[in-house]
Regions:
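Short beta-strand element of the alpha/beta-hydrolase
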Residues: 213-222
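Primarily recognizes the serine-hydrolase "nucleophile elbow" in alpha/beta-hydrolase
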Residues: 295-338
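Active-site machinery of serine-nucleophile hydrolases
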Residues: 223-277
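Short beta-strand/loop motif that positions the catalytic acidic residue
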Residues: 345-347
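A domain-start/cap signature at the N-terminus of enzymes
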Residues: 25-49, 72-214
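C-terminal catalytic histidine-bearing segment of alpha/beta-hydrolase fold enzymes
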Residues: 352-355, 372-445
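Gly/Ser-rich "nucleophile elbow"/oxyanion-hole loop immediately N-terminal to the catalytic nucleophile
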Residues: 267-302
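N-terminal secretory signal peptides and thylakoid transit peptides that target proteins
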Residues: 1-15
Length: 445
């Protein structure tokens, strides 16, 4: 079994050397090298493209999916780019992007390794819970190297009109571009007060200006992503990277903080590890180092990370301007302080813990005088349908909003409903709903 320190070593290797004279390379379609391109989806990181670099600009007009092949994958599009990033698409560029079907069987890079006798939600021990707060889990999520072999099978043309014939050779990727993930810094925080070491990922807004003030989003992962490899929380799903995407940053520039916990941070007995205090201390340290708006601190988390978010809202009721709580629960007897906070809660009716758990929590909040807005949504909706439903829902203007995905809608077609499928698939969808993210950013302390 790979150790946590061994996996997530992506794209290692030296550039492939082409030992042909320049004239031969121009007459045949030999690339200088190939880069594997990954993208994070709601269910994790996938290999979604291969970028092939050429000596000179390639004309996009003559490119087609039939001109390239990638072993074991489906080619869906081929276009020119100025870099290995598909976002840099142009009419002519030295890079050719070979886009791959993200639903291909070999696209998903995550592989779960479970110790014998394990079970429960997202890889925890037998018994259905994540383990006790502070425990080091026995399971891992192992990520395969992002690698592929690409071949040019048809003739393409340079910007100058020269034809590059099929090379007849397969080119192995020798580098990796992880979209959005690579924009995060991997750091560690030594909490002298507690004595903890906390690894974390930090996204700093592009063109950061210390004379401005920026919101900060804290995302905390589920127990299944517990690891001592710092990037794991970025690869597991959209909870962190969605806020740092170019689209979100263009509309809502912010810092994104994604701690990587190496231990269980919250358990089913409504207890947290010392990482709760350490995470708060980290936020305080970052707020002193950067121009962070303390009136616009936001917290979100899935499963165990949601539970930690609730615990923070109870222990530090004036800290966060709003909380996005996804697929988690807590002891209803402890949640009264949440009645005076701004919450957006999302669960699935197929979740045997979070659904009844949040029903109990919101009932307590109403008893405390809070106004709770409720709705049932279809997790299969497209972006336009989610926005229409949100606009109708948000018209109530409630500070506490509770959405449940309808029974059976959160589980992808063909996927088993057994185990924690209804639980895990909640965050596969929840973080994709842009109007919810917009709502979070409208809130201020």
């Amino acid at each position: 079994m790979h150790s946590r320190r061994e996996f997530l070593i992506v794209g290692a290797g030296a550039l492939l050397s082409i030992n042909l004279p320049a004239s031969a390379q121009e007459r045949t379609g030999h690339g200088l090298g190939a880069t594997a391109v990954t993208q994070v989806f709601g269910d994790g990181v996938r290999l979604t493209a291969v970028a092939v670099e050429y000596h000179e600009p390639i004309a996009a007009g003559g490119l087609s999916p039939s001109a390239f092949t990638v072993e074991g994958r489906t080619v869906t599009d081929v276009f020119a780019s100025t870099s290995a990033d598909p976002a840099d698409r142009v009419d002519a560029g030295r890079f050719v992007i070979v886009a791959l079907a993200p639903e291909d069987e070999g696209a998903l890079l995550a592989e779960r390794v479970q110790a014998q006798g394990g079970g429960g939600e997202g890889g925890p021990p037998a018994g259905g819970g994540p383990g006790q707060a502070g425990d080091i889990p026995t399971y891992d999520t192992v990520y395969r190297d992002a690698e592929a072999r690409v071949g040019q099978t048809g003739t393409i043309a340079t910007l100058d009109g020269d034809a590059l014939a099929a090379s007849g050779e397969m080119l192995a990727t020798s580098d990796t571009l992880n979209l959005v993930v690579d924009d995060f810094r991997q750091l560690q925080f030594n909490d002298r007060e507690i004595g903890d070491l906390l690894r974390y990922n930090l996204f700093v807004p592009k063109d950061y200006d210390a004379s401005r003030s920026y919101p900060l989003v804290l995302f905390m992962h589920d127990a299944g992503a517990t690891s001592d490899v710092t990037r794991t929380t970025l690869y597991q799903g959209l909870g962190a990277v969605i806020w740092a995407s170019p689209q979100d940053q263009a509309e809502r520039p912010c810092f994104v903080l994604a701690p990587q916990y190496a231990e269980i941070i919250a358990d089913d007995d409504s207890r947290t590890s010392s990482m709760m205090e350490t995470t708060i201390h980290l936020i305080e340290a970052l707020a002193q180092e950067y121009a962070i708006d303390r009136d616009r601190l936001y917290v979100t988390g899935q499963s165990g990370g949601c539970m930690m978010s609730i615990a923070m809202d109870i222990a530090y009721p004036g800290l966060f301007a709003a909380s996005f709580l996804v697929a988690g629960q807590w002891n209803p007897a402890l949640v009264a302080p949440l009645a005076r906070q701004k919450l957006f809660i999302v669960v699935s009716q197929d979740d045997s813990k979070a659904w009844p758990g949040q029903n109990s929590i919101t009932a307590v909040l109403e008893q405390e005088g809070a106004r709770v807005n409720r709705a049932v949504w279809d997790a299969r909706w497209n972006a336009e349908e989610f926005r229409t439903a949100f606009d109708e829902f948000n018209a109530e203007g409630s500070p506490i909003n509770y959405v449940a995905f309808g029974e059976g809608t959160v589980i992808p077609e063909g996927e088993s409903t057994a185990g924690a499928s209804g639980h895990r698939n909640t965050w596969r969808v929840a973080y994709t709903i842009e109007p919810v993210r917009e709502w979070i950013f409208r809130q201020q302390r």
